[in-house]
Amino acid sequence: EHDFVVALDKEGVNLDTEKLKLNFENWIASSKDVSFVIGGPDGLSKELIKESNFCWSLSQLTFPHAVVPILVLEQIYRVWSMTQNHPYHR
């Protein structure tokens, strides 16, 4: 069983929190592990994006590279807390 690979790219799909939660639940259900791939200052290669299972855009804004992992982790925790009926997401 392979990881479900989510590539982060500015051209990816924009998701609100509820849609991210629904996608997250599907990703977890479809695979043992979910991997998030974050590119460097020049982004990810087109080949890697094409081979990923999903391409997600955090925003059309430009963020410092070091901030993106923090944003991704916070959003993962937020949607996970929603799946557990935890009040963090409010």
Model-predicted regions and their roles:
Residues 28-37, 57-65:
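Short, acidic/small-residue loops that bind anionic groups at enzyme active sites
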Residues 39, 45:
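Rossmann-fold NAD(P)-binding glycine/threonine-rich loop
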